[in-house]
Amino acid sequence: MQEIAQATFNYHDFNEIMPTIFRRFVEKEAHDWRQIYKALQLLEYIVKNGSERVVDEARAHLSTIKILRNFHYIDEQGKDQGVNIRARAKELAALLSDFDTIRAERRKARALSLIHI
């Protein structure tokens, strides 16, 4: 994920990464819930660790993220696999709606990345 976050600072890579993430949200069927969940995880990570443009692009797609707060998928065993997507989408939507929290999370992520270098 760190490599992808770093790639968002490159204009060409950014323009490949972001549309791919948002395509995962709208083009996948409910039974592909794992790909949707992983795309949400990645988006949250790059919002905190990627370029500032990621934040702007994610905020521009906030309505799509908010729709995922109502995601439902019950698998063959009767387990609600949508619960984690709903929770992650709710957290991400809240994060993107609050500039101060975004700044604080990005600062925290930057500090952690310096420790791991």
Where are these regions (language model features)?
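Alpha-helical solenoid scaffolds in eukaryotic proteins
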Residues: 16-23, 64-73
